[in-house]
Amino acid sequence: MKRIFYILALLAFMTVEKGASAQTMSVATNILDYACLGTFNAELSCPLSRRWSLTAGARYNPFTYRRGDPDRQFQMRQQSYSIGARLWPWHIWSGWWFAGKLRYQEYNTGGLRSPETREGDRFGAGCYGGYTHMLTSHLNLEFGLGLWGGLDVFKCYSCPICGVTLSSGKTAFLRPDDIMISLVYVF
């Protein structure tokens, strides 16, 4: 899966038009993802034309927390990879935008609201929208919301550490995603 992601990203970056050479790339990080139990995240963006950009992003959270007692363990571990495109009605990296993404996520969550833990893999596509406010010629502040759906292949356990399987299977999902307040640096 990672190999396919890298090949698609490489092919997409090779299609960049020469007319969009004033600003060649941006890197962004979603501040709200760090509040999600310390999820590291980054998104690279490359212009395809005046109104289109290609994005590739990743999220990573390896952390497990314990409240002084192994039975009170909780986590929201994940690794997630996405590739997509944004339409900018006015100009790239400024104003309103609409986006679509393909995404893969490997996750393990549990112990937050109940001792039940769920882990698995999600594959899907999403629709996103937002607004980018230019702070300086190289620094932007971005706000956005997203919705993604697809296939979830999962297992549920009775607690984060016991390993007793309650259920497993495949199911379709549709869920909110990418509540964004991002800092974007434009090169």
Q: Each PLM stretch: what is its role?
A:
Residues 1-25, 183, 187:
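Bacterial Sec-dependent N-terminal signal peptides
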Residues 23-25, 36-40, 75-81, 119-125, ...:
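Residues that define the transmembrane beta-barrel architecture of outer-membrane proteins
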Residues 23-24, 30-31, 111, 117-118, ...:
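Short leucine-rich amphipathic alpha-helices used at interfaces
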Residues 24-27, 66-69, 110-113, 162-168:
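Extracytoplasmic loops and strand-loop junctions of Gram-negative outer membrane beta-barrel proteins
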Residues 26-43, 61:
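Solvent-exposed loop/turn segments connecting transmembrane beta-strands
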Residues 33, 45-48, 173:
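Short secondary-structure boundary/capping segments within folded domains
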Residues 46-143, 182-185:
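Gram-negative (and chloroplast) outer-membrane scaffold detector with strong preference
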Residues 136-187:
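Predominantly the C-terminal beta-signal and adjacent terminal strand-loop region
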